[in-house]
Amino acid sequence: MALTPTNLNNKMSLQMKMDCQEQQLTKKNNGFFQKLNVTEGAMQDLLKEIIKVDHILDRSDDEDDISSENPQTDFLHKGMLELEAEHDQDLSKQDKQETDVDEDPQASTSLQFSKKNLLELCLKGMFLKLNYWNTKIGLQVKELGADYIDGTEKIDNIIKKINVTENTVKSLLKDMLTLKGQIEKLEDRGLDLDQGTSTEVNTCNEVYELKKKVIERLEDLCKNVELLSAKLRMYQMEAEDTDSHSSEEIDTEEMEALLPQAPASFLVQKSPPRNTAWKRALRIFIMFDVLTVTGLLCYILFFGATFLFERVLLRMLGCRTTWDLREMREPFLNLEVEALLPS
């Protein structure tokens, strides 16, 4: 392969495009890993909340009537008491319509009922959150997996293209090295590259043009021969028609003898002239001979002088007769000048 500036520009543009694609893919991969880190953090937060809820449930069963000393448990108990107060307000509205009962057992049962309801509500809310986060994380994981697969495929394609470009560049460099070696060898030999290449190109062009001319002339000769053969066939058909017309003229003469009152002009129009057809045939035959002779002479003069003696006569007469003719012709062609030469 020949190394040209256009090829180099194309290779550089391909490498620039591949670098841009690699940068885009690295950005996508970074975003993918960031999303994975975010989802992992969310999962860890959810697990922490679940663990906290489990601890709260365990402690609520053991510490229903005992106040906690730690500030964290106090904060959780405050939240539980606020929720209990709201629930107690709702229950007080309902209890106004009912019968009056002792305050101490009613308060204890309402507190236990409110705690159980609060725990159930908290658990339901946590389960709903967990389901929501699970579905959301599953969708994100699917999207990220598809993006990751697309990114890996694109990276593989880019790597393949890079390998192909590297191979092409290596081959071009090898070609350049071989050309440099050849040029150095030619310079050592003292040959002019420009002159040698120009002469070779000129000779090739001349040979190609001569071949074209020969082919065109042969095609023209074939066409002319075909046209002449077609015309000869037409004239043969016309000659046959004239013979048939002559037989018809004899019949017409007999009819004239039978019908003397018929007009002579009508019969003369039917009988075609005899001499014109033969004259046309002779003219065409002479033209055909002239064309063939001129074509052979042109071919002998411009292309091959031994065409008749080495090809045509061998095919027409045979090798034996041609050798006999050569032996008969040799004494007339050889000049006896040995006596005139100095001894």
UniProtKB/Swiss-Prot annotation:
Extract the InterPro entries matched here.
SMCO2/5
Task: Name the principal localization, coarsely classed.
Answer: membrane
| Disordered: annotated span | 86-108
Coiled-coil blocks: 152-238
Q: Where does the record say this protein resides?
A: Membrane
Give the GO cellular component terms, alphabetically.
membrane
Residue stretches of biased makeup (Basic and acidic residues): 86-99
Membrane-spanning residues: 284-304
The membrane topology noted for this protein in its Swiss-Prot or TrEMBL record is: Single-pass membrane protein
Keywords tagged on the record: Coiled coil, Membrane, Transmembrane, Transmembrane helix
Protein name (Swiss-Prot/TrEMBL): Single-pass membrane and coiled-coil domain-containing protein 2
Q: Which organism is it from?
A: Homo sapiens (Human)
